[in-house]
């Protein structure tokens, strides 16, 4: 009985931290999307993790990658935050995003916590069938 009580206690102690993390994660993604909306790729690049920054080297290469590989995040329409789940290096935030043509896309943002802030360490385009009812 004690192990179950201990696990329950850990869950309830972690829940408030998780809730705050969820808000911070969503704020980070929202700020990056706002920067894309304003064509401020230097600012958008600042929300990427150091590993992503080292891959692209700077905002210009990052801009090219976003426009070619993830056009739906550049000047998006409506954005809806879906589930956020832990994964082995941090958290994964699923979102629904509409592009300029009003087509829905589903993305998973992989987030890592560095110090007291969250950074985007990757984005995966998900099949829409993963979210059908």
Place the predicted regions along the sequence by residue.
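Short solvent-exposed beta->alpha transition segments
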Residues: 23-31, 38-89
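Positively charged n-region of N-terminal signal peptides that target proteins for export
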Residues: 1-5
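N-terminal signal peptide c-region/cleavage motif recognized by signal peptidases
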Residues: 14-16
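Exposed beta-sheet edge and beta->alpha loop/turn motif
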Residues: 83-133
